[in-house]
């Protein structure tokens, strides 16, 4: 039996089987694009699809965890529509003639790094939000399927980190507890 020591966010004890969530890192390739106008249209369609998904997550979270906690998905929508974020992606596609997935991944990494290097702990935690939004947008661009949480058995979820969008998609009756390596009280 292995024993780990950590900081608890909530009081209580959970006993049950453990499900380890291992995320696969998507390797995003840089591909030269001749028709940047078509690539921007593809980006805009994926952005709209992502906005719809975030709206659905907001509605689900609103029902399950209340308005205060659901608000993170409105923040995600605002981040996705942020002019600086969108301008950086568009500029990269137009100026470097690269595929949208690559432009989103690079821009997301740059913005996430900027947040991670801020002095304020709350703002540092937004780094994970930028990565979550960017990863969702890349998945939508590439047609990669989202994780199907409906088949999950009741268990203690162990992961390096969990995003708000991952946790709200899980069936709360099947989650006994969360154990994460990364994250903070502000995440």
Residue spans of the language-model regions?
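Non-catalytic, soluble scaffold/interaction modules
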Residues: 1-187
